[in-house]
Swiss-Prot record:
G2: annotated span: 423-427
Cellular component per GO, a single term: cytosol
Organism placement in taxonomy: Bacteria, Pseudomonadati, Pseudomonadota, Gammaproteobacteria, Enterobacterales
Keyword Protein biosynthesis attributed: yes
Comp. bias intervals (Basic and acidic residues): 92-217, 267-280
Positions bearing N6-acetyllysine: 808
Listed HAMAP family: IF_2_B (MF_00100_B)
Organism: Escherichia coli (strain SMS-3-5 / SECEC)
Family indicated by similarity: Belongs to the TRAFAC class translation factor GTPase superfamily. Classic translation factor GTPase family. IF-2 subfamily.
Subcellular location field: Cytoplasm
Protein name: Translation initiation factor IF-2
Ranges annotated as biased composition (Basic residues): 252-266
Gene3D superfamilies, per database record: P-loop containing nucleotide triphosphate hydrolases, Putative DNA-binding domain, N-terminal subdomain of bacterial translation initiation factor IF2, Translation factors, Translation initiation factor IF- 2, domain 3
């Protein structure tokens, strides 16, 4: 017969080549995919497979037993219960080799048990003997000490009669020695008896353990508890077994009952039902039959708490956690209150809180990962193997108006800065530039304080940070923040000292200020390159590019070019005609048009790709920024973008992420609500400024929301009712009308339907293109809600010279105005020795019997104080007025 190859044989057997090679290897034949197979080798493989697949001979015995049990019922009537017990046993025929192996193992085990038993007996004997010797020695020492004490006492007592009682003392001493010897002999006998009992007990224990571990038959029956199908309770089965034993025992039921009684040494306490059954069996009845036992609950409460393994997912309700720990929900709530958290039984808590509660109650916690589907989708990706050099990703960071975008404009030879509202960057711009020495990808970040998160994302997605510092301005707050972001991301920094062409430029000052924050130039022994540039004149631009490429060579940046792409979302927005648009920076692999991408909570197929110039491209490699269309929604800036194989699985992962994010968010909100419940009860009235915010890109929504929420104070709070990307729609206007909110549009406009609702409801709609103006106007609106500050201003002082009595007003103070003006009906204070003794209102003010409204400095007048008559000569009346000062938010 002609030999065939492994591949041909695999095709004939309809199996894979790798599995066939593995089967040959299991049979002891080493083959590769292209080797030939002889007929003898085929037969060897077939014999191996037959031997492997042939099952051992089995014998299954089934037994079914039916019986009737009479149980006494109420009213003296008995009730018959039909009992059926099914048993199944399977006997497996042992292989001869396996039987020999089991016999050898049994013999070895018997020898080991015998050796252990002998060692245990010898050890017990030695320990008992040593213990007896120690006890005898200690007893002798104690006797000797007592004897010495008694002798000393006797000696002191009879010291004056020593001559007369010498003989008696000697006789007493001999008697005591005899008693000590007798006590020592008794102690040795007691120790020997204890030693024998201990050795006998150890031998009995070893013999019992050996009998328990001994195998009685090579054909071991395997019995599964699940094969019992019992149609009544456990109590009925026990009653049937006891009835069978009594019938077999006949007249000897008294002896059987005595033998069935539990031993005294049993560590488990017998239940009440067991004791009653035992008494009934001893008493018996007519004809040797015992009375039927009463049905009693035989459950015994566990003596100690059971520690369980509690599996906790990312979120869990309090009730589910209590069920997993087998405790009441009230106990879990009590434990949470001890830890300082309030919860209800249906409240969802996060994984960390549940772990603390379970560990506090003494259970072992197993944290379950619920993202197996996500991990499976991520692992099923073709990522390629060979890494190739890639272009560096450079982020330009610095303070506002220090010339970041102008510097990038000169490099790109475009005028993007003129297109930015107010001349400040409000988006992350991603561009790649071709130079003579290679390609560089630039990310331009905003410098305003509101865009902190956008700068942080830029630092995380970058390889090199170019820190732009104006030579005339020096280090500013956002410059320091950019340094912190770069250090947190562990990214090298290249410093571009801009505006070097200005007369007031001072580069040395910039170096000194940056050195305070750990940015040292190379000439000072540091690691950062300093380049002097001018974005207007173009000075030093080539040196800056060379410094960037030099730093990139030092980093040896590489990425896999072939395979499925992955990257990060730099920016995202909603376009009215194109739908959700995301700016993606590819990190590795190649992104093609038509790929299925998973991006945070969103997914979709790439319908179109455009570069930063707006031109259509079919693919994008590492370090290339592109805009992609076709996602299911607007992703959050900073989300990971991953190309996957299956769109259905991508949708499942995205929905799972959305649900999990919602659960965790609700759990945290509920937790904060309950924790702040008492604080909210004690707070006074708090005014709220409700805002519905719409912006052009996701990064702007994020930055504006953070800036507005930071404006909140104890009296006025900013509440973002709704936010999103895209134009203002009718839904947004309806939401603003329902919540009495201000509509804010940042670089977006309202459509026709929204304008109708706004006009009908007279809503406050405001458009902005610069974030400074937006924040200032919201501050002004909040300042209008602040309650004014009340301030007391003293307007006059009058000294009491004399006191007169008036039937109408009581005591009238004759005063001289020493300072300011005294006005009628103003609040006053009466001061005596510079201490306020009364505060009230000026009721009557007269000058020469005429009522006047005010009296000026240096004039005399009569003052009547309302509801106060204890005015004395020498008192000072202080007149003041309360003025309101409008507060503003800083």
């Amino acid at each position: 017969m002609t030999d065939v190859t492994i591949k041909t044989l695999a095709a004939e057997r309809q199996t894979s080549v790798e599995r066939l090679v593995q089967q040959f290897a299991d049979a002891g034949i080493r083959k590769s995919a292209d080797d030939s197979v002889s007929a003898q080798e085929k037969q060897t493989l077939i014999d191996h497979l037959n031997q492997k697949n042939s099952g051992p001979d089995k014998l299954t015995l089934q037994r079914k037993t039916r019986s009737t049990l009479n149980i006494p019922g109420t009213g003296g009537k008995s009730k018959s219960v039909q009992i059926e017990v099914r048993k199944k046993r399977t006997f497996v025929k042992r292989d001869p080799q396996e039987a020999e192996r089991l016999a050898a193992e049994e013999q070895a085990q018997r020898e080991a048990e015998e050796q252990a038993r002998r060692e245990a007996e010898e050890s017990a004997k030695r320990e008992a003997q040593q213990k007896a010797e120690r006890e005898a020695a200690e007893q002798a020492k104690r006797e000797a000490a007592e004897q010495a004490k008694r002798e000393a006492a006797e000696k002191d007592k009879v010291s004056n009669q020593q001559d007369d009682m010498t003989k008696n003392a000697q006789a007493e001493k001999a008697r005591r020695e005899q008693e000590a010897a007798e006590l020592k002999r008794k102690a040795e006998e007691e120790a020997r008896r204890k030693l024998e009992e201990e050795a006998r007990r150890v031998a009995e224990e070893a013999r019992r353990m050996a009998e328990e571990n001994k195998w009685t038959d090579n054909a071991e029956p395997t019995e599964d508890s699940s094969d019992y199908h019992v149609t009544t309770s456990q109590h009925a089965r026990q009653a049937e077994d006891e009835s069978d034993r009594e019938v077999e025992g006949g007249r000897g039921r008294g002896r059987n009952a005595k033998a069935a009684r539990p031993k005294k040494g049993n560590k488990h306490a017998e239940s009440k039902a067991d004791r009653e059954e035992a008494r009934a069996a001893v008493r018996g009845g007519k004809g040797g039959k015992r009375k039927g036992s009463s049905l009693q609950q035989g459950f015994q409460k566990p003596a100690q708490a059971v520690n369980r393994d509690v599996v906790i997912g990312e979120t869990i309700t309090v009730g589910e956690l209590a069920n997993k720990m087998a405790v009441k929900g009230s106990q879990v709530i009590k434990a949470m209150m001890k830890l300082g958290a309030m919860a209800t039984i249906n409240q969802v808590i996060d994984q960390e809180t549940a772990q603390l509660v379970a560990e506090e109650m003494g259970h072992k916690v197993i944290l379950r990962r619920e993202n197996e589907l996500e991990e499976a989708v991520m692992s099923d990706r073709d990522t390629g193997a060979a890494a190739e050099p890639r272009a560096p990703v450079v982020t330009i960071m610095g303070h506002v108006d220090h010339g970041k975008t102008s510097l990038l404009d000169y490099i790109r030879s475009t005028k993007v800065a003129s297109g930015e509202a107010g001349g400040i960057t409000q988006h992350i711009g991603a561009y790649h530039v071709e130079t003579e020495n290679g390609m560089i990808t630039f990310l331009d970040t905003p410098g305003h304080a509101a865009f902190t998160s956008m700068r942080a994302r830029g630092a995380q997605a970058t390889d090199i940070v170019v820190l732009v510092v104006a030579a005339d301005d020096g280090v500013m707050p956002q410059t320091i923040e950019a340094i912190q972001h770069a250090k947190a991301a562990q990214v090298p920094v290249v410093v571009a000292v801009n505006k070097i062409d200005k007369p007031e430029a001072d580069p040395d000052r910039v170096k000194n200020e940056l050195s305070q924050y750990g940015i040292l130039p190379e000439e000072w022994g540091g690691e950062s390159q300093f380049v002097h540039v001018s974005a207007k004149a173009g000075t030093g631009i080539d040196e800056l590019l060379d410094a960037i490429l030099l730093q990139a060579e030092v980093l040896e940046l590489k990425a896999v070019r072939k395979g499925m792409a992955s990257g990060a979302v730099i920016e995202s927005f909603l376009d009215k005609g194109r739908g959700p648009v995301a700016t993606v920076l590819v990190r590795e692999g190649t992104l093609h048009k038509g790929d299925i991408v998973l991006c945070g909570f969103e997914y979709g197929r790439v319908r179109a790709m455009r570069n930063e110039l707006g031109r259509e491209v079919l693919e994008a490699g590492p370090s290339i920024p592109v805009e992609i269309l076709g996602l299911s929604g607007v992703p959050a800036a900073g989300d990971e973008v991953t190309v996957v194989r299956d769109e259905k699985k991508a949708r499942e992962v995205a929905l799972y992420r959305q649900g999990k994010f919602r659960e965790v968010k609700l759990a945290r909100q509920q937790k904060s609500k309950l924790e702040n419940m008492f604080a909210n009860m004690t707070e006074g009235e708090v005014h709220e400024v409700n805002i519905v915010l719409k912006a052009d890109v996701q990064g702007s929504v994020e930055a504006i929301s953070d800036s507005l929420l930071k404006l909140s104070t104890d009296e006025v709070k900013v509440k973002i009712i709704g936010s999103g990307v895209g134009g203002i729609t009718e839904t947004d206007a309806t939401l603003a009308a329902a919540s009495n909110a201000i509509l804010v549009g940042f670089n977006v406009r309202a459509d026709a339907s929204a304008r109708k609702v706004i006009e009908a409801e007279s809503l406050d709609l405001r458009y902005y293109s610069v974030i400074y103006n937006l924040i200032d106007e919201v501050k002004a609106a909040m300042s209008g809600m602040l309650s004014p500050e009340l301030k007391q201003q003293i307007i006059g002082l009058a000294e009491v010279r004399d006191v007169f009595k008036s039937p109408k007003f009581g005591a009238i103070a004759g005063c001289m105005v020493t300072e300011g003006v005294v006005k009628r009906h103003n609040p006053i204070r009466v001061l005596r020795d510079n201490v306020v003794i009364y505060e009230g209102e000026l009721e009557s003010l007269r000058r020469f019997k005429d009522d006047v409204n005010e009296v000026r400095n240096g004039m005399e007048c009569g003052i009547g104080v309302k509801n106060y008559n204890d005015v004395r000569t020498g008192d000072v009346i202080e007149v003041f007025e309360i003025i309101e000062i409008q507060r503003t938010i800083a």
